[in-house]
């Protein structure tokens, strides 16, 4: 990603409302520097146009969900499989639109963006271990669908089973809408986890740096940033980031602050 792309990403994620599709496409510029978001936005427009006649004829949230599933799942072939969890492309919206394969959360972004273009109320739901979409409103009629399974309708029993597989019981809080920033944070966290090994440090680095550009992010990410910079040999910036993290976390976790300061001292010592 160029400095210009990162500046644009920052503007998008700090605007209201957040343009989720644009933010996800700008994220993809980290691996494809010449990526142009506009053709992919037009592709989302085209998917919405294809779904429009059936969606317009729907008279309930469940019928709207079924209409979207016909276009996005049956006709366009959007879905996923276990192998997609190990593929970085599954976390990049432009690749998901090209391949029509992806992680649940990126497939959900496709659904949300198509629904938005059609004026259909929809929101993302981050069930433990699996991301899905609700067609409808949080306080009114809604229907849960699983974009990873081609848009399969999820009755309450199926949603409860997904949550139960994570060792939990389904609660109302788990069905709450996710904001675009929360979705972006999860997307970037997925990239960070996929790139956890040393040979993928640079991929993990850009995921961390984009996370730090979000208006809200876990403080721990700043420490991770410092450690990555040190690991990649950027000792000055790494030590400075670890020190900044220590200053921020010190009032609530002095032990963590002391550890970070020790890491910063060791990094600076390597400069001599």
Can you say where each PLM-predicted feature lies in the sequence?
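A structural boundary/capping signal
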Residues: 1-272
């Amino acid at each position: 990603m160029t400095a210009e792309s990162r500046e644009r990403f920052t503007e998008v994620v700090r605007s209201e409302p957040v343009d989720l599709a644009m933010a996800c496409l700008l994220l993809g510029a980290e691996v494809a520097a010449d990526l142009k978001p506009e053709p992919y936005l037009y592709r989302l427009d085209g998917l919405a146009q294809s779904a429009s006649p059936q969606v317009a004829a729907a008279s309930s949230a469940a019928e709207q969900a079924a209409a979207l599933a016909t276009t996005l799942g049956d006709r366009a072939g959007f879905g996923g499989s276990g192998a997609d969890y190990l593929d970085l492309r599954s976390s990049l919206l432009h690749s998901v639109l090209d391949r029509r394969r992806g992680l649940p959360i990126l497939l959900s972004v496709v659904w949300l963006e198509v629904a938005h273009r059609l004026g259909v109320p929809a929101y993302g739901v981050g069930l433990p271990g699996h991301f899905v979409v609700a067609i409808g409103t949080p306080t009114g009629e809604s229907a849960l669908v699983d974009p990873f399974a081609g848009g399969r309708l999820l009755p309450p029993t199926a949603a409860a089973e997904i949550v139960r597989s994570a060792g939990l019981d389904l609660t109302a809080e788990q069905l709450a809408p996710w904001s675009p920033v929360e979705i972006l944070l999860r997307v970037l966290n997925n990239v960070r986890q996929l790139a956890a090994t040393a040979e993928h440090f640079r991929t993990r680095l850009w995921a961390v740096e984009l996370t730090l550009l979000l208006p809200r992010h876990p403080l721990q990410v700043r420490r991770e940033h410092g450690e990555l910079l040190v690991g990649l040999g950027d000792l000055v910036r790494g030590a400075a980031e670890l020190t900044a993290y220590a200053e921020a976390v010190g009032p609530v976790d002095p032990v963590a602050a002391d550890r970070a300061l020790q890491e910063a001292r060791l990094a600076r010592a390597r400069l001599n």
